[in-house]
Amino acid sequence: MLAIVVFVGVQKQDSQACEPVFSLDESKAKINFLDKQTAQFASSTVELMGRSTEGGVQITFLDGNSKKIVDQRFYGETGRSHMRFYFEGNIIFSIVKLNITYEVPITVDNNVSIKSTEEKGYYLDANGRVCGVDVDGVAQPVEADAQEMIKEYIAGIK
């Protein structure tokens, strides 16, 4: 008896399968719901210095004592980055990062014209491992360095 097993579109990350907290569609629906609720959440703001040339800010949105969204914004001479961490209980289930690049450095022209944007969504398992990625809404393979990069992003939450 011969059995042939074919794996299509599966990227091995380690010896254990990576199961995201929610499916991609469920994650996107939860993100959309949470984004619409921010006005109803309590929030606190802290400055984030030393992580970009022009500084940054973090806004933490809470429902009672429960974190729902941590929003980080970093500013630089050639662009800015906007990153949101989405929580289910104490678990981050998704990170969405928007990178914006300016036509010219802000020191040359402070009336910013945007050259390009790129939005990356990272979908995590309950242990913070990246199980899925999309770029501008299109599914992509998980980059080799994604796990370490996401650990650094999470470690930067104040």
Model segments located where?
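Mature extracytoplasmic domains of secretory-pathway proteins
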Residues: 60-110
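Low-complexity, flexible helical/coil segments
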Residues: 29, 96, 104-109, 131-134, ...
